[in-house]
């Protein structure tokens, strides 16, 4: 089944070219199905790129999904016009009265700041607090995962001496969770961050469970045991060229940056990157939508309060 998004959203044309089914609102209205209601809090600077990455993964399921794009009004956006935001994005005030099956909180290029120094931190806290009673399951990505763990559980992030940058091998730490069904024994995920969370800070918290780790990139996948919160420290949604663009961007700035590991053939930036993580990304998002959203959320979203008690 398809995702339902605004007809003129730029990401829609890209997804159509990739043969991903986009449904118009008119056609969706004729299907006697309650679609999943998913809100994406997009904190990344390049809105269109991130929209496309996430919608691509959400569109590869047998479920009909209505997508709402959410922005932080307390942040001044430099890489997208106000007209674009007004056309395609909602403010929290516009959606706070609603309930949703799922929420995705993206990463953001603010990890070197203390959480309280981020200009939209107070607004983000409001969204995360609201999600506890109005969203059935929330998927946090990269800095979004760090922010969620810090806000909900007091788990802080730590700076690393060398940027964790490249595509890293991971393994499953707990096979009991539905979220890791279908994962290979070892699988690959992109990471691009200057900070990390630590296993020893997570283990004492009885509500949380570490599902996957990497020897070199650290803790990757954490969930609340009831599936209502999922924390992903990497970027499984990344397009093939993202790390390449980040590498050349940092070089242009004169930064001391290493070639992303396990990415370019023979570590040659002139060669086309090797994509090792695509199938893992699809499985992860499919599992989250199927096991933690579709199969668990009540048919009537107004009953979410009772379902999550």
Curated annotation (Swiss-Prot):
Matching SUPFAM superfamilies: Class I glutamine amidotransferase-like
This protein's GO CC annotations: cytoplasm
Site residues (Important for substrate specificity), renumbered to this chain: 192
Keywords: Acyltransferase, Amino-acid biosynthesis, Cytoplasm, Methionine biosynthesis, Transferase
Entry's Gene Ontology BP terms: L-methionine biosynthetic process from homoserine via O-succinyl-L-homoserine and cystathionine
Primary location class: cytoplasm
Enzyme Commission no: 2.3.1.31
Enzyme superclass (EC): transferase
Site entry (Important for acyl-CoA specificity), positions: 111
Family: Belongs to the MetA family.
Task of the protein: Transfers an acetyl group from acetyl-CoA to L-homoserine, forming acetyl-L-homoserine.
Protein name (database record): Homoserine O-acetyltransferase
Source organism (scientific name): Petrotoga mobilis (strain DSM 10674 / SJ95)
Gene expressing this chain: metAA
